């Protein structure tokens, strides 16, 4: 089937609506929308919820941009695409809660199509979701990964293990030699076996995000926290910033295509701190995080998992 970019765009717009409505219902605060246009072609709508009852900042961005040539970040691993016109569209979101016991979450689904006269279009889907806890709860990690596994299952037994590993490999801070969080799913360059199959999988990932995240929010939102937990949360948010600015392909793509900087950097936490050579107290919950975020087979842990 010929790729239907219009159909994909309509799904993405609905997905942004659905996620914003769901997060607002949980938090009690509303998103503020900022529509924007890109001079070189395209635009989008950025929605941000600030200082809510649960979420310190939640940003849900839709963008649809197009241009006459693919940017370097997109052709680095596919040089045959150089010189093609392109369309890129997607929904990307990051949620930073107030409560340090609630993890930060990120999700993204996207579609690219590159064309030139006399040649078949080249297209692919990408996306995924990942979780960045500050204090580790095994039952949360198990739920997150089982939700990911279950949505992958209709598409093949090998899909979840493959995209889990890709997520673990991708969200890795090489300069720190540590994982960003506990991962989830990550896929890119998906264009087989056909458009309908790939589009259905992208939809499953997009729709699965709230199913994976909101039960964790509900479970942790009433936990009491203080200055110690807050300081650790702000310190660990620094890792989030480092990854996005140094390693993230999506950030590089947006900046290199002349995307809207405010929307691209919407994923940044509103407050963050760095402290030179800081080390957590041995045996503390903060020290336990480094072990908790090590790559493991979360779906195989028992149902009665407890705090790690």
UniProtKB/Swiss-Prot annotation:
This protein's pathway = Porphyrin-containing compound metabolism; protoporphyrin-IX biosynthesis; protoporphyrinogen-IX from coproporphyrinogen-III (O2 route): step 1/1
Q: Which family does it belong to?
A: Belongs to the aerobic coproporphyrinogen-III oxidase family.
Q: What is this protein called?
A: Oxygen-dependent coproporphyrinogen-III oxidase
Record keyword Oxidoreductase present: yes
Q: Where is this site: Important for dimerization?
A: 175
- Functional description taken from the UniProt entry: Involved in the heme biosynthesis. Catalyzes the aerobic oxidative decarboxylation of propionate groups of rings A and B of coproporphyrinogen-III to yield the vinyl groups in protoporphyrinogen-IX.
Q: Which cofactor does it need?
A: a divalent metal cation
**Residues at the active site:** 106 (proton donor)
Q: Does the keyword Iron apply?
A: no
Which reaction equation describes what this protein catalyses?
A: coproporphyrinogen III + O2 + 2 H(+) = protoporphyrinogen IX + 2 CO2 + 2 H2O
Q: Which GO terms describe its molecular function?
A: coproporphyrinogen oxidase activity; metal ion binding; protein homodimerization activity
**Native source species:** Salmonella paratyphi A (strain AKU_12601)
PANTHER family linked to this entry: COPROPORPHYRINOGEN III OXIDASE, MITOCHONDRIAL (PTHR10755), OXYGEN-DEPENDENT COPROPORPHYRINOGEN-III OXIDASE, MITOCHONDRIAL (PTHR10755:SF0)
Q: What class of enzyme is it?
A: oxidoreductase
Q: Gene3D superfamilies this protein is in?
A: Coproporphyrinogen III oxidase, aerobic
Q: Name one GO biological process term.
A: protoporphyrinogen IX biosynthetic process
Q: Where does substrate bind?
A: 92, 108-110, 258-260
Q: How does it assemble?
A: Homodimer.
The EC designation for this entry is 1.3.3.3
The entry marks the following residues as binding a divalent metal cation, namely: 96, 106, 145, 175
Q: Where is this region: Important for dimerization?
A: 240-275
Q: What does the organism's lineage look like at the top?
A: Bacteria, Pseudomonadati, Pseudomonadota, Gammaproteobacteria, Enterobacterales
């Amino acid at each position: 089937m010929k790729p239907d970019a219009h159909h994909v765009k309509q799904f993405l717009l609905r997905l942004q609506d659905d996620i914003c409505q769901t997060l607002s219902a949980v938090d009690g605060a509303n998103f503020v929308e900022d529509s924007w246009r890109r001079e070189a072609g395209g635009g989008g709508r950025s929605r941000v919820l600030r200082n809510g009852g649960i979420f310190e900042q939640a940003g849900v961005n839709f963008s649809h941009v197009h241009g006459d040539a693919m940017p370097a970040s997109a052709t680095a691993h596919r040089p045959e695409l150089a010189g093609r016109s392109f369309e890129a569209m997607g929904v990307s979101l990051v949620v930073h809660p107030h409560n340090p016991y609630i993890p930060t979450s990120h999700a993204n689904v996207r579609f690219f199509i590159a064309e030139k006269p006399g040649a078949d279009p080249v297209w692919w889907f990408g996306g995924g979701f990942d979780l960045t806890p500050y204090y580790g709860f095994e039952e949360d990690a198990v739920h997150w990964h089982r939700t990911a596994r279950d949505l992958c299952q209709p598409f093949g037994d090998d899909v979840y293990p493959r995209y889990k590993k890709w997520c673990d490999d991708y969200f890795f801070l090489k300069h720190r030699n540590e994982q960003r969080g506990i991962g989830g799913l990550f896929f890119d360059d998906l264009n087989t076996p056909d458009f309908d199959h790939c589009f259905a999988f992208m939809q499953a990932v997009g729709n699965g995000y709230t199913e994976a995240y909101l039960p964790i929010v509900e479970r942790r939102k009433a936990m009491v926290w203080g200055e110690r937990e807050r300081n650790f949360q702000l310190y660990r948010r620094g890792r989030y910033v480092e990854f996005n600015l140094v390693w993230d392909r999506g950030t590089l793509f947006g900046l290199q295509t002349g995307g809207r900087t405010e929307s691209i950097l919407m994923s940044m936490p509103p407050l963050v701190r760095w402290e030179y050579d800081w080390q957590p107290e041995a045996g503390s919950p903060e020290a336990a995080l480094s072990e908790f975020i090590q790559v493991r087979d979360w779906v195989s842990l028992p149902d009665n998992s407890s705090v790690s």
